[in-house]
Amino acid sequence: FEPVVKDGKLWARGADDDKGQGFIQLKAFEIAVKEGLLRCNVKFLIEGGEEIGSPGVEAFCKEHLDLLKCDVILVSDTSMVGLDTPSITTGLRGLAYWEIEVTGPNRDLHSGIFGGTVANPINELCKMLAGVVDENGRITLPHFYDKVETVSTQERAMLGAVPYDEEKYKAAIGVKELSGEKGYSTLERNSCRPSFDVCGIW
């Protein structure tokens, strides 16, 4: 639908996620050009399929490596620490996704008849997954942290200064306690440290 300005705010499909952010970036660069502040070339890659995995983007990037060469990447789709707190995200953790297939008997076995005699694939998978994160919240996969950057003293100070209410965070997601890697704050774990999460078993 057509964008409409109401009470000084832009209402439109995607205004919040993510066309609004992209529009802000475009306007910022427009101002920089008009004011003579831009000292480099800028390239825009805009696509609208992020919510379905951005089909075609990977192939496009591989086919146009020279065109897309750059020193810095600016991304629109990031979070804010609060509705009233403007936020600049200076880095993203990235994503690695795997599917693990565990095989067993040639059919679904009745646990009352076969239980205790045959390894249950789901039980075996749970054993594997249970060992991936230790009691301190650290991921045990070999070399997992080899290229993970250390949270700097400056970054920790900046995150520590962010107006953040952990109790409100817990209430919003309906939990009594938070967990994760020991030695880091919730914001540090959520923004600077890697995590291991199981997204489904079927």
Each predicted region: which residue ranges?
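Histidine/acidic-residue-rich, glycine-tolerant segments that coordinate divalent metal ions
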Residues: 39-120
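Active-site metal-coordination/substrate-binding segment of hydrolases
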Residues: 1-43
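Generic secondary-structure signature for well-ordered alpha-helical cores
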Residues: 34-37, 65-66, 105, 127-138
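Short, well-ordered turn and helix-capping elements at secondary-structure junctions
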Residues: 7, 48, 78, 200-202
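Short glycine- and Lys/Arg-enriched binding-loop motifs that mark or flank ligand-binding interfaces
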Residues: 4, 8-10, 16, 49, ...
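Active-site-proximal alpha-helical scaffold in enzymes
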Residues: 19-35, 54-61, 119-131
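Acidic-enriched catalytic cores of C-N bond-cleaving enzymes acting on peptides and small amides
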Residues: 81, 90, 111-201
